[in-house]
Amino acid sequence: MKKLTTLLLASTLLIAACGNDDSKKDDSKTSKKDDGVKAELKQATKAYDKYTDEQLNEFLKGTEKFVKAIENNDMAQAKALYPKVRMYYERSEPVAEAFGDLDPKIDARLADMKEEKKEKEWSGYHKIEKALYEDKKIDDVTKKDAQQLLKNAKELHAKADTLDITPKLMLQGSVDLLNEVATSKITGEEEIYSHTDLYDFKANVEGAQKIYDLFKPILEKKDKKLSDDIQMNFDKVNKLLDKYKDNNGGYESFEKVSKKDRKAFADAVNALGEPLSKMAVITE
């Protein structure tokens, strides 16, 4: 009986040991898989860091040209540069939270400043937009505002390498931005004087799509159907924007966009935002 008990105990220990080995193997596989995903997320974030650096570099170059046009009293050149230069900034807007107080200094609207009772502190591109498109003049105040804008653009450019960009910020920022496009920017509130809103929309969509493209390989391993759904909705939004391209590589005035198309665009962006918000699955 003692021998039988000993044999049974030995067998139990052997089975338990084998079970522990299998468990360790499974844990090892899971750990390696998690490490692989973390490495891919890190690589994608690094690539987006580089993308943001490039956009802010071009934004600074464009702002220098824009300010030079203001200094030369060249209204036509300043207006030609205005929407195109701003696109570099708008592409980076998913992570504008990382810009700190430089974001409102560069991109604040008068309505927002009034709401916060800070209209006397208003500065940036939209203040100059008002001078060019509504007041239709370049004076000493405009030139002073342009110099301050350039100073802020240089500061942001210098800060680019130290921005705290994370996968969470990228994902949440892209969803929040598209939600803003669909609910408030679609009214024309962003470029209220110049009506160059479609340039902003295109840049915002491109910025969000860049984030999707970088995370796409990871997402397709987790949820191929979700990835395909996001791509399909990006295609729909871009197709609607293409409808209002002009012959010079730019976009028509937002005033020319029909109410029907404004609604269609808002609906398309909302439809995109819904699956895009599920991309956080890649971090799980």
Swiss-Prot record:
Name of the protein in question: Efem/EfeO family lipoprotein
Predominant localisation class: membrane
Record organism: Staphylococcus aureus (strain MRSA252)
Topology in membrane: Lipid-anchor
Recorded family membership: Belongs to the EfeM/EfeO family.
InterPro entries (alphabetical): EfeM/EfeO_iron_uptake, Imelysin-like, Imelysin-like_EfeO/Algp7, Imelysin_sf, Iron_uptake_EfeM/EfeO
GO cellular component: plasma membrane
Keyword Mitochondrion included in the entry's annotation: no
S-diacylglycerol cysteine lipid modification positions: C18
Range of residues in the leader sequence: 1-17
Lineage: Bacteria, Bacillati, Bacillota, Bacilli, Bacillales
Coiled coil: none
Gene3D superfamilies registered for this protein in UniProt: M75 peptidase, HXXE motif
